[in-house]
Amino acid sequence: NVIKQRSLIIRSIRRFFEELYFIEVETPTLLSVNSGANAKPFTTHYNALGEDFFLRVAPELSLKKLLVGGMERIFEIGKNYRNEGMSKRHNPEFTSLEAYSAYTDCNSMIKVFMELVNHLSLSYDGPELKIEVISMKDLVRQAISGAEVTYENLNEVFEIYVAPFLINPTIVT
């Protein structure tokens, strides 16, 4: 059933990162200031303090503070909350995985992510996956050749003309 599968997958993710010497951390989900992704937060009133607080939209800033503080390899599997629309692709409460490693670049973390995806696929008798790494701009250019793409409209054009048609495992940079 889905609950057991989810538990096994999360356990596999933890083992994968532990074998790479990452430390699992847990960062606050109740924050005095909104931080992280450009998303609308849920708010709540903290009665004891008489102040409004926010449920986190992403753990990114808290995790990066740990990096600056000397934690070299960290990951978190945790809940995030976004007070926005709901769809087949978006749920206001969701679990995410974020991992960071000091002294590396995005290409190193892309490699770790590709290894993780294949580790999970092979762990559950799936195939080894060929994962393509391609820029959002290049995908948009392929989808609508000749169209002018600017930084301002890139994400919107991607969501309309590219994302619905991505089938194979793809890392969009």
Residue ranges with predicted function:
Residues 35-41, 116-173:
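Metal-assisted phosphate- and nucleotidyl-transfer catalytic regions
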